[in-house]
Amino acid sequence: MEFAFYFAAGVAVLATLRVITNSNPVHALLYLIISLLAISMTFFSLGAPFAGALEIIVYAGAIMVLFVFVVMMLNLGPAVVEQERKWLTPGIWVGPSALALVLLVELLVVLARTPSGAGIGHTTVDAKAVGISLYGPYLLVVELASMLLLAALVAAYHLGRQDAKQ
């Protein structure tokens, strides 16, 4: 089980480095999705299936769709759109697809080896404990994170509009 944790953490670090070093926002989004899925796998291997499922649903699902809309709102122009069409060849999908396939195999191995769902810590964190923590001592942190995401969305929209005016 420790191998699954370290392997998922390594994939998360590798994918996050590709997000940071990639100059194309669409390609960076692909690697960000893989990074979020790898972080979800670390939660699963630590025995927190609820946190892993939330990571997939909330971050890899909803927030990534929001990021795609923000990239689309930036309206990069016809030259960039044509360049995007050239970049979106099947070869671009090899890296994220390989990392996603490795994570899928790891998920199947983790689920097959632990029938109880307990991981490295040998305890399972259920939804009730997460809810009590989120709406208890960590309520301010959750609200600050939501405000930070909203500010990032407004800033991206504003920066996109400033470029369009010039």
UniProtKB/Swiss-Prot annotation:
It catalyses: a quinone + NADH + 5 H(+)(in) = a quinol + NAD(+) + 4 H(+)(out). Pfam families: Oxidored_q3 (PF00499). Gene3D superfamilies: NADH-ubiquinone/plastoquinone oxidoreductase chain 6, subunit NuoJ. It is a multi-pass membrane protein. The keyword Membrane applies. InterPro entries: NADH_UbQ/plastoQ_OxRdtase_su6, Nuo/plastoQ_OxRdtase_6_NuoJ. It is found in: Cell inner membrane. NDH-1 shuttles electrons from NADH, via FMN and iron-sulfur (Fe-S) centers, to quinones in the respiratory chain. The immediate electron acceptor for the enzyme in this species is believed to be ubiquinone. Couples the redox reaction to proton translocation (for every two electrons transferred, four hydrogen ions are translocated across the cytoplasmic membrane), and thus conserves the redox energy in a proton gradient. Composed of 13 different subunits. Subunits NuoA, H, J, K, L, M, N constitute the membrane sector of the complex. Belongs to the complex I subunit 6 family. This is NADH-quinone oxidoreductase subunit J. The lineage of its organism: Bacteria, Pseudomonadati, Pseudomonadota, Gammaproteobacteria, Pseudomonadales. The gene is nuoJ.
